[in-house]
UniProtKB/Swiss-Prot annotation:
Cofactor(s) listed in the protein's UniProt record: iron-sulfur cluster
Gene Ontology biological process: iron-sulfur cluster assembly
Binding site for iron-sulfur cluster: C55, C119, C121
A family per Pfam: Fe-S_biosyn
Domain of life: Bacteria
Protein family: Belongs to the HesB/IscA family.
Name by which UniProt lists this protein: Putative iron-sulfur cluster insertion protein ErpA
Region (Disordered): 1-20
Native species: Nitrosospira multiformis (strain ATCC 25196 / NCIMB 11849 / C 71)
Cofactor detail note: Binds 1 iron-sulfur cluster per subunit.
Purpose: Required for insertion of 4Fe-4S clusters.
HAMAP family on file: Fe_S_insert_ErpA
Keyword terms, alphabetized: Iron, Iron-sulfur, Metal-binding
Subunit: Homodimer.
Amino acid sequence: MNTPFNDGSGQTDPMTDIPTPLIFTDNAANKVRELIEEEGNNDLKLRVFVAGGGCSGFKYGFTFDELISEDDTVMEKNGVKLLVDAMSFQYLAGAEIDYQENAEGAQFIIKNPGAASTCGCGSSFSV
């Protein structure tokens, strides 16, 4: 399907006036770009996925991928492509993918309003 989605602005799609379903922040896109530059492979894209497991039933995952699958939703922000497979996308609708650095460390964070509960570390959730 390779459907484009939110530009990360948190705004509505001007063509449909429907809220954008996924937000990819500037902080996250810029950090991914840094990591891709460190790897020296401009074909890399960030894949975000949901898998069974974790203390709350589902867990988030991040990996680099060179290939775009037929059922992926593809988003580009600041020159970085984000991939989400169709199954994972249904659990990530309305979520924000961000990167934060603080006194506790640095990490990618998913703020998911569709999650009924999350674990303390924020890496797993339930619906």
